[in-house]
Amino acid sequence: AYILLGVEPDLDCHNPLLATEALKQASLVVAMSPYKHSAALEYADVLLPVAPFTESSGTFVNAEGRIQSFNGVVRPLGDTRPGWKVLRVLGNLLGLAGFDHESSEQVRDEVMPGAGQFADGLNNAIVDLPLVLEQSEPSASLQRIAQVPIYFSDALVRRAASLQMTKDSAVPTVRLAAETIENLGLSVGGAVRVTQNAGQALLEVEVDD
């Protein structure tokens, strides 16, 4: 069984097809999200509405290990509740211990008791790993270097119509060196089919030297 809180596996996971196929095979999937995501209807048995993080208090721990608590910008819409409150009620209904918190601050203090500005146990130390990189043999095949556009990165910005109209939300393309385009028999502005595992996409070719 899986409980998904604020995640859309078909868009957020490294291997979306593998993730969604695993969810389809699960005995139970509960998806908690502010949005009725069409893909979730294919694998989720239960959809529970929760408030987005902008309408809830909570705490983030960033990559530096810095603790960042925040308040909701506005109150949740209608009877919507923050995710932590929905989890608390589920715990109460199942008769589980440790689900009696009255605020997100109580949750934070229990998870990180006595924490100051930084979370304990987080650092950038490299342990038990060699610091010498092994040089790999040259390969004749191409290596894909991809990025996630800034306005594709989470459920909130993906649904912001104004942000999707910006230059940073342009449709992804395949950018190759002019020599590579010629060697592959492609043309600038033409289409090329890109595959990854069982997934594929038809993308426009651009030159990038």
Identify what each model region corresponds to.
Residues 1-79, 86-89, 93-97, 105-209:
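A cross-kingdom feature strongest in bacterial/archaeal respiratory oxidoreductases
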Residues 101:
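Nucleotide-sugar-dependent glycosyltransferase catalytic core
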